[in-house]
Amino acid sequence: MARLTSIIALFAVALLVADAYAYRTTITTVEVEENRQGREERCRQMSAREELRSCEQYLRQQSRDVLQMRGIENPWRREGGSFDECCRELKNVDEECRCDMLEEIAREEQRQARGQEGRQMLQKARNLPSMCGIRPQRCDF
């Protein structure tokens, strides 16, 4: 009888542990989903054109330089105040929003550029965080 009571008690403890683990997993999944939705909403509320004006200017200038040089280009040129100011602006943007905002700017500028210039502009925008020495190192868009 004592043996049966011990087995039942052990089984009850195992059920409680399993139930608590399943509950924890469910809560974690919900929290991750809520965090992602919160980030997307927070990033949407920021205006890329206002927050990253110098980055927009830097990408536009890079595009103009490519056109003027007709194919002879230094793609990572960092001269001028717009690059430094762009890095300062990027550092002030929430890390989770940087790539979304850079993509918004780059896609708009790409629409105005043509062919190869547009692709090069996207590449530069993807690598801007790395050039500025901030995270994420590269944006995937």
UniProtKB/Swiss-Prot annotation:
Keywords per UniProt: Disulfide bond, Seed storage protein, Signal, Storage protein, Vacuole
GO-annotated cellular components: aleurone grain; storage vacuole
Disulfide bonds: 43-97, 55-86, 87-132, 99-139
Main location: other
Residue span(s) of the pro-peptide: 23-35
Superkingdom in the source lineage: Eukaryota
SUPFAM superfamilies for the chain: Bifunctional inhibitor/lipid-transfer protein/seed storage 2S albumin
GO MF assignments: nutrient reservoir activity
Cell compartments where the protein resides: Vacuole, Aleurone grain; Vacuole
InterPro entries with a match to the protein in the record: Bifun_inhib/LTP/seed_sf, Bifunc_inhib/LTP/seed_store, Napin/2SS/CON
Keyword Disulfide bond attached: yes
Cell membrane recorded as keyword: no
Residues annotated as signal peptide: 1-22
Subunit structure: The mature protein consists of a small and a large chain linked by 2 disulfide bonds.
Protein task: This is a 2S seed storage protein.
Family: Belongs to the 2S seed storage albumins family.
Protein name in the entry: 2S seed storage albumin protein
Organism annotation: Cucurbita maxima
Lineage: Eukaryota, Viridiplantae, Streptophyta, Embryophyta, Tracheophyta
